[in-house]
């Protein structure tokens, strides 16, 4: 798959060797397969035979269903919800999902992680891990592997510094008492 800039729009060549171009917006709109269902996810999970994390969980109901089909992890993610004005962020959902299933599988906060303090907040809410794509991709595009390594160093140094400022010496010290919630 190739990308190129046509006018002011980024285009993706659909297949190698063809001249069919698709805008980035159209590509991501069409790659969302709404025919996938819970039976498909359960089949994938059972056939995988190992740890299996389901991405895109944004409700307690779906988190419980992921447990029921045998997932060992979930990624609380709104799949680029920045394109859906007013949608809840993974941070908004995280605490209630962790409360419901956090003792049964690993809850990973995916999305909205742009700095170490975001990781600190997600881990304090009970996430076992954090995931993010844009910072990694920006760093990769700007400086290759060295850029990604530097971005990860920045994440780590911010997290360690801010944990020290909070009086926490290890990740397991993080909890919701470390956070102040807006009312």
Question: What name fits each language-model region?
Answer:
Residues 25, 78-88, 137-140:
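Glycine-rich, proline-tolerant flexible connector loops at the mouths of alpha/beta enzymes
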Residues 44, 66, 74, 122, ...:
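Conserved, mostly hydrophobic/aromatic
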Residues 47-51, 67-81, 100-104, 126-130:
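Glycine-enriched alpha-helix->loop->beta-strand junction motifs that scaffold or abut catalytic
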Residues 92-183:
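Alpha/beta catalytic cores of nucleotide-metabolism and tRNA/nucleoside-modifying enzymes
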